């Protein structure tokens, strides 16, 4: 047996449903994918429910499941994981939130929840960090930019709770909501008040920021309000290396995925030019993967763009991006010391523009892997594969067994 390392390649949102503009095929079926098809033909395939049949997975719960951390035990909300991914060191008990920079008009209505898909908000985040003062509540905070319009907020202090609503109206043309406690608990009441004060102060800071004044002069949407959601209290995770006896790394543009990786103890490996969209640096990601395998036993590589195209309902763009992914994966064929597993984390069908419970295709290729009769990697072909239908909670244990890292159950 020569394989002693694991590549977990997650094609985010790869699964789909029949699309009219693709003659009833899914984008993955319609795409020309000689590399993925070769990996499928040289390995074993199947389909996978990352949480369970009929359950629509979030990107957060699905990645926890794929890494062997049952979300029913470990998931406390998306916010703290996003905050970790944005570079905020989240300690046990801190309250984390996802955040968006958005555009609010003079009437107080949100007109663009992504602030014109603004690219770099670090100056805005720095101003908020320097000028917002929550000391009257006995609370400190961290606020950090993510990719594009995304950001994260973390609160620290005594007597805080995660039981609060969002100010995000979830649609344009509506004013931001007040953050409300979801219970009568004093901790939730306090956190709601802190959040509303943070939003009030940050909105005033953004209104007068030179970067926003310049955007208005250039005809661009200003980032004039922060929308927060996904509150959660940071939990504890058994370190990945201690849990599985493997040194691990994560390569991803999505701050959620890097946050999950860092939370469980994977080393975050940055890559220049990654965007989390269909414009990302695919070649750089795969080259970085190859280099990281020289120093780590396990690498999680997440490629996000297909998910974005699915949410936008752009089946042809999704197909074309899948073909670009496939071309970039040619380097993987050179590695014989690895078990290569390719999978989705969930389906994002273009017809519904949202996550669905449709199972995702999975393939495993490497030394010692049984080879089935499947010759293509897509949702339909893989359903006939030798893995049959598995759960996300199963996949890492299957991979660990293939590199002889599991133990006999019983005698």
UniProtKB/Swiss-Prot annotation:
Record's function text: Catalyzes the interconversion of 2-phosphoglycerate and 3-phosphoglycerate.
E.C. code: 5.4.2.12
Family named by the database record: Belongs to the BPG-independent phosphoglycerate mutase family. A-PGAM subfamily.
This protein's name: 2,3-bisphosphoglycerate-independent phosphoglycerate mutase
InterPro entries reported for this sequence: Alkaline_phosphatase_core_sf, ApgAM_prokaryotes, Metalloenzyme, Pglycerate_mutase_ApgM
Pfam families registered for this protein in UniProt: Metalloenzyme, PhosphMutase
Organism ancestry: Archaea, Methanobacteriati, Methanobacteriota, Stenosarchaea group, Methanomicrobia
One annotated GO molecular function: metal ion binding
Reactions it catalyzes: (2R)-2-phosphoglycerate = (2R)-3-phosphoglycerate
Classification via CDD domains: iPGM_like
Domain of life: Archaea
Gene3D superfamilies, per the entry: Alkaline Phosphatase, subunit A
Enzyme class per UniProt: isomerase
UniProt keyword terms in alphabetical order: Glycolysis, Isomerase
Coiled coil: none
UniProt pathway annotation: Carbohydrate degradation; glycolysis; pyruvate from D-glyceraldehyde 3-phosphate: step 3/5
GO biological process terms, semicolon-separated: glycolytic process
């Amino acid at each position: 047996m020569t394989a002693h390392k694991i590549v977990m390649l997650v094609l985010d949102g790869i699964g789909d449903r029949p699309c009219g503009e693709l003659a009833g095929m899914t984008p993955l079926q319609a795409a020309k994918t000689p590399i993925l098809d070769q990996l499928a033909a040289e390995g074993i395939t199947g389909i996978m429910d990352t949480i369970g049949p009929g359950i629509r997975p979030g990107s957060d719960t699905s990645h926890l499941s794929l890494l062997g951390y049952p979300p029913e035990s470990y998931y406390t909300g998306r916010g703290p994981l996003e905050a970790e991914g944005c570079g905020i060191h989240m300690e046990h008990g801190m309250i984390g939130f996802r955040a968006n920079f958005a555009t609010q008009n003079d009437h107080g209505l949100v007109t663009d929840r992504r602030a014109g898909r603004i690219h770099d908000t670090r100056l805005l985040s720095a101003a908020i960090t320097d000028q917002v003062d929550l000391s009257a509540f006995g609370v400190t905070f961290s606020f950090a930019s993510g990719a594009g319009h995304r950001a994260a907020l973390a609160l620290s202090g005594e007597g805080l709770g995660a039981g609060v609503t969002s100010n995000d109206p979830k649609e344009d043309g509506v004013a931001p909501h007040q953050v409300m406690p979801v219970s009568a608990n004093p901790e939730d009441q306090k956190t709601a008040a802190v959040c509303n004060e943070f939003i009030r102060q940050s909105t005033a800071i953004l209104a007068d920021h030179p970067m926003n004044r310049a955007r208005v002069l250039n005809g661009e949407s200003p980032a004039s309000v922060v929308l927060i959601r996904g509150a959660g209290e940071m939990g504890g995770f058994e370190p990945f290396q201690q849990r599985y006896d493997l040194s691990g790394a994560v390569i991803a543009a999505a701050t959620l995925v890097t946050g999950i990786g860092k939370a469980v103890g994977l080393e975050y490996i940055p890559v220049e030019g990654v965007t989390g969209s269909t414009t990302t640096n695919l070649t750089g990601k795969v080259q970085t993967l190859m280099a990281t395998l020289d120093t780590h036993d396990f690498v999680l590589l997440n490629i996000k763009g297909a998910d974005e195209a699915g949410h936008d309902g752009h089946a042809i763009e999704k197909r074309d991006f899948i073909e670009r992914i496939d071309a970039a994966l040619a380097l993987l064929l050179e590695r014989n010391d690895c078990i290569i597993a390719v999978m989705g984390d969930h389906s994002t069908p273009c017809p519904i523009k949202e996550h669905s419970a449709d199972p995702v295709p999975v393939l495993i290729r490497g030394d010692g892997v049984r080879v089935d009769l499947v010759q293509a990697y897509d949702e339909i072909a893989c359903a006939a594969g030798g893995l049959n239908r598995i759960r996300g909670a199963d996949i890492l244990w299957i991979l660990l067994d293939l590199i002889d890292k599991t133990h006999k159950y019983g005698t």
